[in-house]
Each structure stands twice: as C-alpha cells, then as structure tokens.
C-alpha cells in the first residue's frame, strides 16, 4: 500500500484477532477485541517504566494491518477525532482514567524496576496476590480457572503509600 513492496517492516507481527482476520460483524468478537484493548492499556499504563502509546491507541485506531503507514496521507493514517464511535469514546475514557491513576499514585511511577526484595518496611517492593490475599504460587499462576490477580506495590522507597491493583475478569 505504501509503495515499499514489504521492504519497510517485519512480517513477525504478534497479533491476536480473536479468530477472524480484519473487520467483522460478529459482536462477540468485537466485544472480545475491545476487552483486549482495555486490558492491554491497563497492563501498559500500570506497569513500570515509561508507557509508550502509539498515536490513536487511546481510541483503538487501526491501520488495517499496515505496520508502517508513514507515507499514507489518507484515512489510513489520519486520526478520526471528529467521528469516533461510542466504543472508542469508552476506550478513551478508560485511557484517561488509567493515566489519572498513574499520575495520582507515585508507587506506579517508580524510578527503579521491581526486584521482589524487601524494602525498609520489610515488605517486598512488589507482591502478587490471589483474590483471597494469599501470595500467588506456581499452581495459582498455572491455574486456567484463575480470573483474579492483585499486585501490591510497597511505596516506601518512593516516600509514597502502598498501592494495591486488583484485576478481575470474572463474568467478562
């Protein structure tokens, strides 16, 4: 499409389309794709380090499989701000909420990566917990029935309070 005859990028793309390539009218697949977008934005914006969003990720923008549309001066590369759909408005609101959480909770903006080692409080800098508050063990990580996960970040090294992030996919 961009005149590069596939010389401008890799074909080693890691994508998951929920069983259908390209656009679909299947509402179940569309719902699953939107859930994946929210989950991945949450993973990115609540993770350590500098979050790297691509222009339009906050509204689920697609370039229809073109991983390098730099030379496209058309709808493929434009951001459709004047005509976003309700699901895109919802995704944008989710992104805003996640960035607000990141700004409000210093423990999510650490200057160091987690080690799992105890901090001056005696607690590990990060703990992974089951829904019942017990530590995740190998069996919990491997259990396909596990639908909840909690991350407890000890904020002491940064002079902030601890932060608990709870992720629950039950019923979704």
Where are the model-predicted features located?
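Loop/helix patches that line or flank the sugar-binding groove of alpha-linked glycan CAZymes
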Residues: 1-172
């Amino acid at each position: 499409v961009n005149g590069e005859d596939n010389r401008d990028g890799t074909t080693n793309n890691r994508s998951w389309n929920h069983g259908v390539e390209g656009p679909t009218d299947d509402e179940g697949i569309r719902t699953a794709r939107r859930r994946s977008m929210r989950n991945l934005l949450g993973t990115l914006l609540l993770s350590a380090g500098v979050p790297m969003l691509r222009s339009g990720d906050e509204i689920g923008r697609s370039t229809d499989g073109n991983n390098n549309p730099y030379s496209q001066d058309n709808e493929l590369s434009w951001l459709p701000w004047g005509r976003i759909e309700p699901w895109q408005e919802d995704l944008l609101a989710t992104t805003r909420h996640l960035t607000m959480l990141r700004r409000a909770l210093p423990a999510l903006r650490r200057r160091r990566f987690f080690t799992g080692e105890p901090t001056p409080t005696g607690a590990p800098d990060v703990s992974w917990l089951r829904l019942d508050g017990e530590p995740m063990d190998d069996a919990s990580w491997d259990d396909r029935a596990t639908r909840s996960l909690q991350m407890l970040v000890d904020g002491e090294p940064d002079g902030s309070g601890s932060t608990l992030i709870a992720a629950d996919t039950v019923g979704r």
